[in-house]
């Protein structure tokens, strides 16, 4: 997996083409991350290098100004090659997209957060939804993967 220097998103960025390039690279490592039960740091670095962590930030604050539907396509394409990368990335993305939406539609005071995400390339994390303390599940290793039985209240 190659790691280039970080680039700022440019107006007119072809996010889907960039996602396809990253997906092709992370596909080879997906099984490794799953079998080692390790964080998808390589995929995260590639996403950061291409400016994806600021993609949902409005352009006027230094972000990539990607739309919601296009970001969903990006996450879908990543998920087809490495579900763990797509899931971890979506946990950041939904927080930034929500802050951008609230700024645009509710005039919420999220400008400071959005500017910092863009300027500092911050990665945000979330708890994963509603009452995660009552979530439970079991993952049993099987030949060729895992059998997962779980309950999550959204």
Regions found by a protein language model. Name each.
Residues 1-73:
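Alpha-helical interface subdomain recognition
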Residues 41, 45-49, 54-154:
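Glycine-rich flavin
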